[in-house]
UniProtKB/Swiss-Prot annotation:
Gene: kdsA
Name this protein carries in UniProt: 2-dehydro-3-deoxyphosphooctonate aldolase
Keyword Transferase set for record: yes
GO cellular component: cytoplasm
HAMAP family registered for this protein in UniProt: KDO8P_synth (MF_00056)
Enzyme class per UniProt: transferase
Amino acid sequence: MIPNPRVEIGQAVFANDAPLALIAGPCQLESREHAFEMAGRLKEMAEKLGLGFVYKTSFDKANRTSLLGKRGAGLDAALPIFADLRRELGVPVLTDVHTEGQCEILADAVDVLQIPAFLCRQTDLLVAAAKTGKVVNVKKGQFLAPWDMKNVVAKITASGNPNVLTTERGVSFGYNTLVTDMRALPIMAEIGAPVIFDATHSVQQPGGQGSSSGGDRRFVETLARAAVAVGVAGVFIETHQDPDNAPSDGPNMVQLDKMPALLERLMAFDRIAKSK
């Protein structure tokens, strides 16, 4: 089985030759109220721009730098919130999974199961996610060459699921540093699945603040523009109304009220990149 070059998630279409789509939301699920506020505002932005949109949030940040780091609301609290976001707001929902058992539990509550970058080669996890029949978004590991994602995608498609997204989120370059090799985007596109560019984790500085990760949100738009100019199916952007006080990944998240202008500029680049 080969991956589908066009993956539809709700009203959003992800394809390397289709108009740009968006995956966006806060790093972690903080509360029901916060989730509805963020999802509602992002949905409104996307609708005004005519942009396909999937809401992302993580119920458990299982790879925090420190044991003391806040990890999110947890699975039990997340399940009804995810279901209500889909039903009441009509937004597709993406969340991370970390174990095989979580895949089946979450399958009825979300639209996309995301494999974290650190776990992208875990065969049992990939197979379990694939067998739910949900769309699977795999973050390319910071340690992985782009051409090696072919084997990752093959584990999912061989398990009977052709609906795969692959996401570039930077590659390790020395200690506490990531860089983005834009060649990875067309290389990954050759695999046949839609390619997403994660603009916010690409500016992360893993473990860069000692007991937490740092980052530099100044460069989110720089990298996002470059990726969209190369040509991608979608962008992945973590955003928060108050990034400096967010429980995780604040240094690399985009201020929520700056999202509309950023998205407008990225859509302009996308139109040029995909013009015939």
